[in-house]
Amino acid sequence: MAKKRVDKRGTRKPITKIKFLVEGITEKFYFKELLKFKEYSAHLDIDDIGGGGYFAFTREISKNKSLYDIVVIIADLDRAVIHFGEKEKLVELISLLEKLNIKNNIFLTYKNIETWQAATLPYKINDLSLELGYSGKSKGKEDIFQRLMDKGAEFEIGKRKFKLENLYYIKQGLEKGKFKEGNISKTQSNLIYFFEYLRDVLEAKIK
């Protein structure tokens, strides 16, 4: 007599899905491969907004908020310094993220993502595109993560080159973040606690 099949699907722990939103295609290529490398593939859902500034993130989240559980944004901070009105739009974006879900977060780098990528190398460089062997700017290069790895880049190296006290916006836990206005144009990146935050979000018990 055949054994009765037991459906164990109901006992499986659901996988927490995080929606990652980045500015452009280069960031998408880089973080997609980085997250795979760090074994976050099960939680990987990443899209770029095609530029457009902080309001483009706000528009995307507002339009699709019913589809998103947790949203993590990765963006450049120099826009808030250079362009009139962008700082206010950034603050509005952060307020929206916190209002929708305290697990949401934004990771900002000044000047931009290339600043972070260059910092992950074990030596100082002047031109990231040139160092990685690109004939033009490094924008839109599908293999940028691998080229960085081939040069000895490590996420942990980048973490050591930025200071927590230099951050403009700090949100390390599941509570509202804090602003330090005087830091907005300092070289910085809160990617220094990126994976620690993801771990805490995935292990969190709060809804």
Which residues does each PLM region occupy?
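C-terminal accessory helical subdomains adjacent to catalytic cores in phosphodiester-
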Residues: A2-K17, K28, E33-L44, T58-V72, ...
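Short hydrophobic beta-strand that contains or immediately precedes a catalytic carboxylate
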Residues: K19-E23
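Short beta->alpha junction loops
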Residues: L44-G53
